[in-house]
């Protein structure tokens, strides 16, 4: 029987954590109030972390805590208590990049698994084995590795050492995320969780002896995004990832929206389940699952370094996202043939909305008999942000349903 591969999803707050679990994650990774590589998301204070662990464990899933900054010496005094608090909350593993943090974790909370972060830059089996000897249960391979190189690590490490590989999300233009642009340009240290993402900004090229003369890099007069990476997407390559020996498929995006978390988790869950039900090197992702990859905010996709040196990993024309779909509403209640929803973006009488439910292929509903619940009046438009509306439906709708609409093409 083929081993089960874990699907690991990000969660920036409790709402995203709940959606990740409902839409199919086997495990989630979150950040605490300190020592995590994302300082901007809501993150989890000790009480929230305890509640998150309880929710995740009740669903039979796991929760991993990021402790993957590169802390300075003056920050270390707070680390043991932080780790002990996380252990008491019930986290299943710490994600760690720094060897000093690893040593402190083994002293402060020795029973908690340690996963070595991609920030550690593991690119060979000698490094993987060294971390295993230090007590690591899992390594997260550097994004710069090919699948052949991951397979080489798998072949030269103990089977007890798990291998986690990124399969989806944003990629850093610096090696394994070790960037100093943000610190240099705006004083925000990317290696301590505060990246301003200057790689996404627009740049011109100037030769130092010709100040004021800006040279074209691309056929655009407005500059070019020369540092800007595309987004990783490996959903069509599950057989290759499994053959390389990955034990866990990791999705990037703790700072992404709740909708993103739900859609990307659901898509990979459905693709993985379809593959493991009938494993074959010729496996093809169901068309409707593949279509989901275009229904969330993303940059142009790439397979990154997985198949060798990166040739077309930059997106030179824009630092922004492709956004073709809007979340219109979330399920609130259903009373008979009336679906009651919380509005998120405007929609109108007669609109055809697509409904995404956990474990199901999306289906459509037509908005009929639209009513504003606050006063019970009929309306042609649900255009008041966060208000409650209802409309007629002819089928039951899941309490976890997300209702969305494709943006009009102007």
What is the meaning of each model-derived region?
Residues 38-55:
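Glycine-rich, positively charged N-terminal anion/phosphate-binding segment
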């Amino acid at each position: 029987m083929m081993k089960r591969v874990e699907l690991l999803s990000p969660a920036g707050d409790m709402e995203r954590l709940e959606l990740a679990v409902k839409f199919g994650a086997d495990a989630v990774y979150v950040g605490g109030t300190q020592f995590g590589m994302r300082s901007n998301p809501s993150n989890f204070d000790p009480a929230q972390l305890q509640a998150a662990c309880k929710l995740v464990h009740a669903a039979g899933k796991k929760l991993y805590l990021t402790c993957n900054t590169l802390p300075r010496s003056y920050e270390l005094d707070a680390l043991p208590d932080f780790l002990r608090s996380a252990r008491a909350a019930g986290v299943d593993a710490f994600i760690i990049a720094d060897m000093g943090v690893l040593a402190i974790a083994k002293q402060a909370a020795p029973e908690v698994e340690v996963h070595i972060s991609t920030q550690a830059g593991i690119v060979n089996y000698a490094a993987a084995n060294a971390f295993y000897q230090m007590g690591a249960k899992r390594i997260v391979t550097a994004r710069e590795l090919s699948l052949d190189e991951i397979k080489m690590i798998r072949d030269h490490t103990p089977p007890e050492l798990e291998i986690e590989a990124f399969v989806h999300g944003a990629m850093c233009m610096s090696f394994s995320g070790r960037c100093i642009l943000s610190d240099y340009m705006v004083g925000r240290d990317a290696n301590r969780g505060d990246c301003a993402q200057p790689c996404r900004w627009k740049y011109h090229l100037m030769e130092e002896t010709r100040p004021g003369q800006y040279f074209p890099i691309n056929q655009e007069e407005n500059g070019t995004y020369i540092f800007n990476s595309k987004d990783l997407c490996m959903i069509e390559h599950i057989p290759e990832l499994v053959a390389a020996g990955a034990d866990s498929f990791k999705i990037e995006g703790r700072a992404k929206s709740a909708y993103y978390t739900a859609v990307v988790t659901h898509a990979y869950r459905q693709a993985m389940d379809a593959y493991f039900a009938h494993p074959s090197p010729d496996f093809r992702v169901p068309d409707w699952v593949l279509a989901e990859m275009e229904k969330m905010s993303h940059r142009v996709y790439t397979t990154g370094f997985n198949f060798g040196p990166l040739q077309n990993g930059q997106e030179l024309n824009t630092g922004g996202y492709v956004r073709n779909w809007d979340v219109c509403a979330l399920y609130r209640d259903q009373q008979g043939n009336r679906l009651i929803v919380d509005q998120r973006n405007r929609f109108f009488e007669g609109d055809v909305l697509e409904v995404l439910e956990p474990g199901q292929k999306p289906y459509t509903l037509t908005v009929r008999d639209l009513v504003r619940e606050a006063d019970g009046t009929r309306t042609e438009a649900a255009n008041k942000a966060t208000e409650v509306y209802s409309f007629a439906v002819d089928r039951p709708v899941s309490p976890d349903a997300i209702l969305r609409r494709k943006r009009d093409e102007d």
